[in-house]
From Swiss-Prot:
Boundaries of every SAP domain copy: 564-598
Ranges in a coiled coil: none
Organism: Rhipicephalus appendiculatus (Brown ear tick)
Entry-linked CDD domains: KU70, vWA_ku
Keywords assigned: ATP-binding, Chromosome, DNA damage, DNA recombination, DNA repair, DNA-binding, Helicase, Hydrolase, Nucleotide-binding, Nucleus
Pfam families tied to this protein: Ku, Ku_C, Ku_N
Name used for this protein in its record: ATP-dependent DNA helicase 2 subunit 1
Subunit and partners: Heterodimer of a 70 kDa and a 80 kDa subunit.
Length: 600
């Protein structure tokens, strides 16, 4: 059974959806929360322990909405009572390592509502043995299916063992065992009570996994809830790499890099089909059948065809992949261009972020850093030939260098690396029609008034300040339904203009602009309605304009130039009608039909 060999949607799928299956990559994070008496000293009506519980709850809610299959667990250390598989003293497993749900969130809310006194009655306070705590972490991860495993310690006590060097040494040995097992350990330290300073060099500096991040010293301890939530979110939300690729700088110079997605639009989760009787998730299967015999076909039984000279050429799946594979996946350096030239290039699609991958090719970090510093110093960008995966169409990209930035506390805010920005090909550019003559132009005085008004209303935009109101309302309703609450929270819509603030900042400028733009006898409302009326006098006018634009296109000339694919379907169909040709349903078939008619 043959199929026409045409460009399918899956052949042009996005790199992020075709390279890595995010559904199979499950992250696991364990919160180790200090429950000793020092965490319960009240400051401004709150305690460090309750702040940590609120941070863990916030992480659970974020996981439910963004990564529902990820695993989250909570271990309290320094309690009087114990609850763990090995019966270690002073270690209490509050939440097993599992996907967070309504029950786990409600449990934390109850713990917060009960307060410190109820906690002391139920759990109590005791001593700390970090080796036992880390052993419990390793045991919990060994029974889970987590791929990327992390342990996050939250404490304001820099000396949990009270000067016991023997216990410190045992904890360091156990931390190394975690590292060998692929478990990362990190620290979020809070400000100790009083005027004390947190001293990580006593113990925790030797426990954390990524010591390179703390070569310039640990950031200052957080003392505010907002800062604690930010740090926990940054530690938890480690970017999962999209792919690892070789980067060829020359015939014999190669390094390895990893690609990440820094920013992508968030959408609603995909619909999951459930069985009617037991609510179990249904698995979908697709089977291809032969039209003549209704026999189920295997992938090797299916071939694709392409017509050449009136005859069909048959290709199996492997041959099609070989034809499409122009080169192995990777980045190939072609040259350099100044940033002043590249800043004028149009936007094609969202960019990726490149970071060195030392684990695949040794020395990649040094070579990558040298290239990054040279590009920043000379203000140039490498131009590269990029193939993201096998049988993927090649792309031309340039690498935009980004310098590292840290906040006043030493916390990294912007990572060093390159943004991979795609360059357009010639056929990606649209041919825009020239503006019609006779259009009304604003006077210089009106432009000056508009500029003054815009200057007064200018502010620094950051995407973190504007949440999608539709998504926030959707998740708020789901949260209320899952937690059995009567009313859902109504999130504030920050995308709507704040008219009071706008009037306070630029009220005079706005009034002056309206008076100049709409003099006596003409208001903004009537002008807008008249404009809408003229635009809505019927789709007939718009249709007539599009037909006139299509009639101005010389299809024969475009066919000789090989630009038929850039024309719209309506223009191609009009040409087929004029020539008396049978008009197929698909654009590619229409193009082939016109080529045959013109003998091209």
């Amino acid at each position: 059974m043959d199929q026409p060999w045409m460009r399918q949607d899956d052949d042009e799928s996005d790199d992020e959806s075709s390279t890595v299956d995010f559904g199979q990559a499950v992250d696991g994070i364990l919160f180790l929360i200090d429950a000793t008496e020092g965490m319960f000293e009240e400051v401004d009506g709150d305690t460090a322990f309750m702040q940590c519980i609120k941070a863990a709850k916030s992480t659970m809610l974020n996981k439910i909405t963004s990564s529902p299959k990820d695993l989250v667990g909570i271990i309290l250390f320094g309690t009087d009572k114990d609850n763990n598989p090995n019966r270690f003293k002073n270690v209490y497993v509050l939440q097993d390592l599992e996907s967070p749900g309504a029950e786990s969130v409600l449990k934390l809310e109850k713990l917060i509502a009960d307060g410190p006194k109820k906690f002391k009655q139920e759990y109590g306070h005791g001593n700390v043995n970090m080796a036992d705590v880390l052993w419990t972490c390793a045991l919990m991860f060994s029974k889970s299916r987590a791929g990327q495993r992390r342990v996050l310690v939250l404490t304001n006590q820099d000396d949990p063992h009270k000067g016991s060097g023997d216990l410190d040494d045992k904890a360091v040995v156990k931390a190394k065992d975690l590292l060998q097992s692929g478990i990362e350990l990190d620290l979020v330290h809070l400000k100790p009570p009083g005027d004390k300073k947190f001293r990580p060099q006593i113990l925790y500096k030797n426990l954390v996994t990524d010591k390179e991040n703390y070569e310039d010293g640990f950031p200052e301890a957080s003392d505010k809830m907002e800062e604690l939530l930010l740090r926990v979110r940054m530690k938890d939300h480690k970017k999962r790499r999209l792919m690892s690729l070789p980067f060829w700088l020359g015939p014999e110079v190669k390094m390895s890099v990893s690609l990440y997605n820094l920013v992508r639009p968030t959408g609603k989760p995909a619909t999951t089909r459930l069985a009617r009787d037991n609510n179990e998730e249904l698995l979908s299967r697709r089977i291809t059948y032969a039209m003549d015999s209704a026999e189920a076909l295997m992938p090797g039984d299916i071939s694709k065809t392409q017509e050449y000279g009136g005859r069909k050429a048959y290709f199996d799946i492997c041959e099609v992949k070989q034809i499409k594979s122009m080169a192995p996946p990777g980045l190939q350096l072609l040259g350099f261009k100044p940033l002043s030239y590249l800043e004028k290039q149009p936007h094609v699609r969202p960019s990726h972020f490149v970071y060195p991958d030392e684990g695949s090719v040794r020395g990649s970090t040094r070579l990558f850093a040298a290239l990054l510093q040279s590009c920043l110093r000379h203000r140039v960008a490498p131009i590269c030939f990029w193939i993201s995966r096998a049988a993927q169409a090649p792309k031309l990209v340039y690498l935009l260098a980004q310098e590292e930035e840290r906040d006043p506390h030493g916390l990294q805010m912007v990572p060093p690396g390159f943004h991979v920005v795609q360059l357009p090909f010639s056929d990606d550019r649209r041919r825009l029609q020239a503006l019609q003559e006779g259009t009304t132009k604003a006077t210089p005085g009106l432009v000056a008034l508009a500029r003054e008004m815009a200057e007064k209303l200018r502010f620094t935009y950051h995407p973190d300040k504007f949440e999608n109101p539709e998504l926030q309302g959707f998740w708020s309703c789901l949260e209320a339904l899952a937690l059995d609450r009567d009313d859902a929270e109504h999130p504030k819509d920050y995308t709507r203009p704040d008219h009071e603030k706008m009037k306070a900042k630029a009220g005079e400028e706005m009034d002056a602009f309206l008076e100049a733009a709409f003099p006596d006898g003409c208001s903004a409302t009537t002008a807008g309605s008249r404009k809408r009326t003229q635009a809505g006098e019927g789709g007939q006018a718009k249709k007539a304009r599009s037909e006139n634009q299509g009639s101005n296109v010389d299809v024969r000339e475009e066919a000789k130039r090989g630009k038929l694919a850039s024309l719209t379907v309506s223009v191609l169909r009009d040409f087929c009608k004029q020539e008396g040709l049978r008009c197929p349903s698909k654009k590619a078939e229409i193009v082939d039909c016109i080529k045959k008619h013109l003998k091209l």
